[in-house]
């Protein structure tokens, strides 16, 4: 069969010249699509339905109809751009579905029985301290505008049941953070969705969108958000949230410290604790203290107890509480500096400089001969050690006291941001970490002004199987 015959067979009709030339360079992909056995694929879809879709199971005939309908969609489309998108979507599905999602229903006898890598801890041991910390952080009135992601899709239950298995089968390329990772540490923690980082977010979401379409008939949309680094989110027809995922390179994935619990990797709880402290420099996170206090207390109790155990530290022991609050802010340059040298000469570098504009850090790195460290969306900043300083990008807002100094809440956030670098590189930082953890209850200072965060440029990028919108990013 020559190329023209192959293209005509794929289209279900004779291709005109513009369409033929557009598809000529896609012949290899088209051949793989045509050679794909839809009957085998149907069996994978049905196994997925029977294992993970507990309610509203669709009839086999309806799932088969949707599968056939999509793989003949090009027969009914005339626009060249849409046909090209269909080719790309179909090619991703036929070449990756089995290893990405199809494998979830295959018995995995190669995996030995795994035991939790964590000790049994008393996660309520420091509840009073955490409660005092969170109450001292209540510096807003809680009346801020509601955050965007309030609506959750009814598809979440179906997706979560798959994601738990997905994280086990793909733990060399995917791991989780957030509430589900804390649930693995402490089963008393409730979770609503599963937050993931992985090396193939786009491929995973395309396959998931197709699986949802075939097994439920529901239509989803994927969107890449410009102001969050390598972040893709999936919505349903009502713009309700289904799942999201951060994309990281394999190099960054391997560099991020993590622990294994029940075959699932989670980000090192110390990194998660520091990130939680850092995020309180955002006013909307401070507003959460008025509406989600109990949840936040349980989460911070869990993380703090694990870190104290892991680093063999105690609250109330040691010296230097509050020392990491020795920071200043240059308003015109939008640069904050933390002097951390007071806690010991062994810390290097001891001066931490936070640029609030990413372009300023990029310029500094570009002018340097030293290699910057990159941890992707985990820190949302590259870091550069140079001339006795550690430079980074602080992507949050910054709270200032009336005299123009960083507010204690933001001082802790800045310290947590830079301590993530030391933890993730394995550099010694125990005295500084102990100092921060003993400084979580901040002095009362309700008055503050807000320094806005860096405004990220870019457009939202849409991928849609239903509307044939395929963009390679």
From Swiss-Prot:
Which keywords appear in this protein's UniProt record, sorted alphabetically? ATP-binding, mRNA processing, Nucleotide-binding, Transcription, Transferase
Q: Which GO terms describe its biological process?
A: mRNA processing
EC code(s) of this entry = 2.7.7.19
SUPFAM superfamilies attached here?
Answer: Poly(A) polymerase catalytic subunit-like (SSF160957)
Instruction: Return the InterPro entries for the record.
Output: PolyA_pol_cat_Poxvir, PolyA_pol_cat_sf, PolyA_pol_nucTrfase_Poxvir, PolyA_pol_nucTrfase_sf_Poxvir, Poxvirus_polyA_pol_cat_C, Poxvirus_polyA_pol_cat_N, Poxvirus_polyA_pol_cat_N_sf
Gene3D superfamilies from the UniProt entry = Poxvirus poly(A) polymerase, N domain, Poxvirus poly(A) polymerase, nucleotidyltransferase domain
Asked whether the keyword Transcription is assigned, the reply is yes
| Lineage top rank: taxon | Viruses
One molecular function GO term is: poly(A) RNA polymerase activity
List the active site: 193, 195
Pfam families (alphabetical)? Pox_polyA_pol (PF03296), Pox_polyA_pol_C (PF12629), Pox_polyA_pol_N (PF12630)
Which reaction equation describes what this protein catalyses? RNA(n) + ATP = RNA(n)-3'-adenine ribonucleotide + diphosphate
Q: What class of enzyme is it?
A: transferase
Enumerate the transmembrane spans: none
Quaternary arrangement and interactors, per the entry?
Answer: Heterodimer of a large (catalytic) subunit and a small (regulatory) subunit.
Family, similarity comment:
Belongs to the poxviridae poly(A) polymerase catalytic subunit family.
What task does this protein carry out? Polymerase that creates the 3'-poly(A) tail of mRNA's.
Q: What is this protein called?
A: Poly(A) polymerase catalytic subunit
Biological source species: Nile crocodilepox virus (isolate Crocodylus niloticus/Zimbabwe/Ume/2001) (CRV)
The gene behind this protein is PAPL
């Amino acid at each position: 069969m020559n190329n023209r015959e192959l293209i005509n067979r794929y289209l279900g009709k004779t291709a005109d010249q513009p369409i033929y030339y557009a598809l000529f360079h896609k012949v290899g992909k088209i051949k793989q699509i045509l050679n794909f056995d839809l009957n085998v694929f149907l069996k994978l879809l049905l196994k997925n339905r029977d294992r993970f879709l507990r309610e509203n199971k669709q009839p086999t005939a309806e799932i088969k109809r949707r599968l056939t309908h999509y793989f003949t969609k090009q027969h009914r489309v005339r626009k060249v751009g849409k046909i090209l998108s269909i080719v790309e979507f179909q090619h991703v599905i036929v070449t990756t579905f089995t290893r990405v999602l199809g494998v979830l229903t295959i018995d995995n006898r190669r995996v030995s029985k795994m035991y939790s890598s964590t000790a049994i801890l008393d996660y309520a041991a420091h509840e009073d301290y955490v409660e005092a910390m969170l109450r001292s952080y209540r510096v807003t009135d809680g009346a801020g505008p509601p955050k965007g992601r309030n609506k959750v899709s009814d598809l979440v239950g179906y997706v979560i049941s798959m994601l738990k298995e997905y994280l086990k089968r793909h733990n060399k390329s995917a791991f989780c953070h957030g509430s589900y990772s804390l649930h693995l540490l402490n089963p008393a923690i409730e979770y609503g969705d599963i937050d993931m980082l992985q090396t193939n977010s786009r491929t995973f979401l395309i396959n998931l969108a197709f699986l949802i379409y075939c097994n439920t008939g529901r239509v989803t949309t994927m969107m890449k958000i410009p102001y969050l680094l390598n972040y893709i989110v999936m919505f349903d027809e009502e713009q309700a949230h289904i799942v999201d995922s951060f994309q990281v390179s394999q190099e960054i994935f391997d560099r991020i410290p993590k622990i294994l619990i029940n075959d699932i990797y989670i980000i090192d709880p110390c990194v998660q604790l520091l990130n939680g402290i850092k995020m309180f420099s955002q006013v909307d996170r401070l507003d959460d203290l008025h509406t989600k206090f109990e949840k936040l207390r349980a989460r911070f109790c869990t993380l703090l107890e694990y870190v104290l155990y892991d680093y063999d530290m105690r609250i109330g022991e040691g010296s230097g509480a509050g020392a990491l609050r020795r920071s200043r802010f240059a308003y015109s340059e939008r640069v904050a500096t933390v002097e951390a040298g007071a806690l010991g000469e062994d810390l290097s570098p001891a001066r931490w400089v936070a640029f609030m504009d990413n372009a300023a850090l990029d310029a500094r790195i570009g002018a340097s001969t030293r290699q910057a460290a990159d941890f992707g969306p985990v820190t949302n900043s590259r870091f550069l050690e140079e001339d006795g300083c550690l430079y980074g990008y602080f992507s949050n807002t910054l709270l200032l006291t009336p005299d123009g100094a960083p507010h204690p809440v933001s001082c802790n956030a800045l310290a947590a941001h830079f301590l993530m670098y030391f933890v993730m590189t394995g550099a010694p930082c125990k005295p500084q970490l102990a100092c921060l953890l003993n400084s979580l209850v901040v002095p009362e200072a309700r008055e503050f002004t807000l320094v806005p965060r860096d405004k990220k440029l870019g457009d939202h990028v849409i991928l849609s199987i239903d509307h044939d919108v395929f963009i390679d990013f």
